[in-house]
Design a protein with these regions (language model features):
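N-terminal beta1-alpha1 cap of cysteine-dependent amidohydrolase-like domains
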Residues: 1-266
Length: 266
């Protein structure tokens, strides 16, 4: 039973009576400080034991030490960082819920409180990017579709590169980091993704070969786990600790290998 306050015995009696269940099966689900306290609270109510008894299953004592340690770390961070999330759907934070939760989980793993600074990419320009991003510890540009806010994202990526601010580009964000590098480091002023500018003279991001000729694009993205070989001198290799990894993808465009040599050399 969801409740803001502990259930009095009389309330439990009434619930048991009208729900036709034993009183021992009326368990309170109190509000908790953080979501991840909920399993611990339910264990205190012996939920697992009650469920196992109903199903006539054995119910060994669970080892929740690691979970308790995680909850403690969540509520007692030893440091703080601010990460700018530069996107175009920021009015609806749930549009980036998986990114937000990943940042929070990464913070917990490092005893760090992560504050997200929401930045509307449509408002970012070469003139104000420093003012907007000078107070952040990291910059993240997530995925998205369409050309709205693209140049603002590229300005944020350039600012991160030029000021050695940790940067993570996801999906379109990663692709735009290639576009920014090609433009501002290599000198290909017209560099772009053919998804956004089909007539670009430097298509550093292009349609994957196996997607060419597909006119009905609904449900045709490359999906699922896909192998990736990491360069041994890369940050990714340092973090993964292995050369070949597998990650899930949902893409139709990728880095154009015709530009791989010049990108690596610069």
């Amino acid at each position: 039973c969801r409740t803001e306050h502990p259930l009095e015995p009389g309330i439990k009696d009434k619930i048991a009576l009208f729900c036709n269940v034993p009183k021992s099966h009326v368990l309170q689900n109190l509000d908790v400080e953080i979501l991840y306290d909920a399993p611990l609270a339910m264990e205190e109510e012996h939920l697992a034991q009650v469920a196992c008894e109903c199903l006539e299953l054995e119910c060994p004592e669970p080892d929740l030490d690691e979970w308790r340690a995680m909850c403690k770390a969540w509520k007692n961070p030893t440091k703080k960082v601010t990460v700018a999330l530069v996107g175009k759907y920021i009015q609806l934070h749930d549009a980036y819920i998986s990114v937000v939760e990943a940042l929070k989980h990464g913070g917990v793993a490092n005893s760090c409180d992560v504050t997200i600074k929401w930045v509307d990419s449509e408002t970012v320009t070469a003139q104000n990017v420093s003012e907007i991003l000078s107070d952040v510890s990291g910059i993240l540009v997530p995925g998205g579709f369409g050309d709205r806010g693209i140049e603002g994202k590229i300005q944020a990526i350039r600012y991160a590169r030029e000021n050695n601010i940790p940067f993570l580009g996801l999906c379109l964000g990663m692709q735009l980091s290639i576009v920014e590098f090609a433009r501002d480091v290599i000198g290909y002023e017209d560099a772009h993704s053919v998804e956004l500018k089909p007539d670009t003279t430097h298509p550093v991001i292009h349609l994957m070969p196996d997607q060419e000729g597909i006119d009905d694009i609904g449900g045709t993205l490359r999906l699922g786990s896909y192998p990736c070989v990491l360069a041994k001198d890369s940050k990714a290799y340092e973090l993964y600790g292995e050369e070949t990894i597998h990650e899930r993808h949902r893409h139709r465009y990728e880095v154009n290998n015709d530009y791989r040599k010049v990108l690596v050399e610069n």
